[in-house]
């Protein structure tokens, strides 16, 4: 066996600003050509380990290092970020934050210009990588104009063009719709083999990453590595939920049906999965589950009639949409990036005004209501928390809306503390917001709206950046207020797990119109809609098809059984 290209020996790291180590006694070897997934709950040390891999620690994030870490023969404490960047290319969670060129081709060539390469050499390299990454038609575009998947390919080109042999991805699926995420994983797998790369993926969406083969799954918890093995071995041991991670849907379905995972072969690859008598087992389980009648919501809350809007009136993003949301519904709004999901939300909340159409809330026209007046009834939580935060301290941020509305100090304290506990932020209530991770900031903005107790909530990608524990806590809380207060909640999401687990109605946007309005199980088993809306077949759909079950019935019964178990 060849020598490891990455090696940590008894390695620990403590930030200067912290009183305890963030990484504890890390022992890890990664070999050339391996594709490794690093997973773990928020605060487990994944991001810190990533910063060690690309040299940001200890150069940009000073602290105390014990033990040894070597990357491609270089000791991280003795190497510069520049030296390590020659071997390690990093693709960030938000590609926009690493673009430096005005056009795609300029961004691709940036590192070559720094290396003082000749124009013919730069032209040859950019043409080669543009072809490899399917960017030929985008070279003159601004990176900011591109879709999420295209932006990610540009970011990859910018680091691969310098012949980096180690590629580090920080949550590559966070901003992608399901279809783009599936394509991204396929591209990464292809590059691993064709370019002889060593790939490290930091991601908590394990099922989506496992759509392509992974050599090893490394799970972190409390700054330590608690599992390091083949994905199949870890899945068979049912360690996922114990370690704060979401297990694949098909694995949950097998367990619900009473399958002994010890009898399963190729458990990490649904296409190759082998289980004795699995078809009969699944059919028997499906027959034994009786679907309950869904709850009927018949009191209109938000009525939208013939709504049309376009930044260019000749090219409407929202085109003659008519839909009614009822009191007490929990709704998922889905569709390909750029289809108008956020635009529709901005129209509802008054940040944009429609070219035509009407909206009524609780029987009253929204046409003459200001943004503030609408905000008293409709809470809107943006995808990027940094666009909402207006104070420096967590408690003050959550309390701001109540203070502006003249709520008494004692009541402010009571309501803020209650919401902070539900959102998992109570212990941080006196912290500055700048000390929080992206996911923690997200929870602060959700808390700041929930504390106002509006009649309707719109949440844009509410679970982005959340680990399983905080995802479950947040969605359990939203479900509770939905059921107990009959609050209408609309979730703009790419998370198909969320659609199935927590919503009873899915509205699919595409081409300016509503493509489908139905139960999540109906949407996610409709092949035509999946393709049009850039969704992806869930593993439940694939499992049902492979064993001659009605996919819609199977998915609906799985969802019901999961909710009953929860």
From Swiss-Prot:
Molecular functions (GO terms): ATP binding; ATP hydrolysis activity; ATPase-coupled transmembrane transporter activity
Known function: Probably part of an ABC transporter complex. Responsible for energy coupling to the transport system.
Record-given protein name: Putative ABC transporter ATP-binding protein lp_0149
Cellular component, GO annotation: ATP-binding cassette (ABC) transporter complex
Family according to the record: Belongs to the ABC transporter superfamily.
Domain of life from the UniProt record: Bacteria
Predominant place of localization: membrane
Organism, as annotated: Lactiplantibacillus plantarum (strain ATCC BAA-793 / NCIMB 8826 / WCFS1)
EC numbers on record: 7.-.-.-
Keyword Transcription regulation: no
Cell location: Cell membrane
Pfam families in UniProt: ABC_tran, DUF3744
Bilayer disposition of the protein: Peripheral membrane protein
Domain ABC transporter: 6-247, 302-536
Annotated ATP binding sites: 40-47, 335-342
Keyword annotations of the record: ATP-binding, Cell membrane, Membrane, Nucleotide-binding, Repeat, Translocase, Transport
